[in-house]
Amino acid sequence: MIPAQELVEHGVTTADGAGADGCVVLVQEGSHADVRFALNQTTTNGVHRSRTVSVVAVAGTAAGTATRTGVVGEAGVEEMVAAALADAKAAPPAEDAFSLVEVHSDPALSFDRAPEETDASVLDEVLSSLSGAFERARARGAVLAGFAEHDVATLYLGTSTGLRRGHVQPTGAVNLVGRTADGKGSAWVAQPTIAPSLRTMEEEIWRRLDWERKTVSLEAGRYEVILPPSGVGDLMATLTFYGMSGQGAEDGRTVFSKEGGATRVGEAISALPFTLYSDPVESGIECTPFVATGASSSEISVFDNGLPIGRTDWIREGSLAHLRYHRAGAARSGVEMAPFVDNLVLRCGEHDGGSVDDMVARTERGLLLTCLWYIRQVDPATALETGLTRDGVYLIENGAVVAAANNIRFNESPVDLLARATEVGTPVRSLGREFGEYLNRTIMPALRIPDYNMSSVSQAS
């Protein structure tokens, strides 16, 4: 198969020869390894490779795009250029039209590096640890299930301006679920890395299943809740995915809208000094430091491909600081351009309530949640969301977990939760249960919410 760099060069040259006013070619070489397990035994494992090619052709101020996944060679990219250019010539002027990004130097983003790959051996340590875990689960009369996966994506970007960029992005995760023999009790832990301490994860499963020995029934109502980093990460992900659109706010469609097409940027949304930010060079969760997209939306533009990304504070010290805009949208609105960044961090100044266990020890009566699931937005104007607890709701009394409780549906807004939080734990590397698949790189604290709205009892188990 033709090397990715040669495919990029061929696409750019083909577009120039076809009379395109500009061109962007992106090639992503993917490599994936995984293992799945259930009923205390491994069930499947595999390794696969992938290639995704995207072409953007510019005609005047219009753009056309084409994307293919699979074995794409020179003939394939020629077909893609022709299709993208035909679409561009037939399209009206693009709302996100802007000059393509000019050449800028960054030796760290080498276009010449060979694609990196993963293979089955990266899972050897996990598989070795699982063998002992399965034995201990059988001895306890418990059942373990879950999966481990590792991806390496090598991205190549080239444009008709002469810009060339490359980036390697590894991503890993291990999810572990334990269930009691009767299936009535369950616990979940996960780590966003392929090399966790599986024994530590396993011990946490056993601790939580021990809590399941005594159960209580809870009714709907408002409860003091310790929301763990996983749940906080999922809610902050939904807030940034759905709520941080600058165009959406100006159109009156989000929680950060104001009358007359204005936005709430600059307004305080929390008395605590929360800072929610994204930064491609944040230690431990580094990510692609330039714009790379095969399609435009109201917030991201194909014209911005290759543009360097720096740190963006979405919320700074309790006030809304930025919304998401591409260059054209930012220019129209007279604000800073702020693209999507593939990581997310929540901190709260000097506030550090310690670990989840530390926060439990300071709780007179409340609930400890494991994670959130089936999170869906109900009202974009308030960022109201509904969802379910999953794999463990625990009753805390006098600083200790005393029983497990039933699952409960919640109705809450992430913005309101930040406003009502009374304690913030130590930010840690975390993995959201629902959105971790899409946003693996997060650092989140646990939050204490004094009046979390549990709207109805769930029969889920």
Predicted regions and their residues:
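Dual-mode signal for accessory low-complexity, basic/Gly-rich regions
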Residues: 261-461
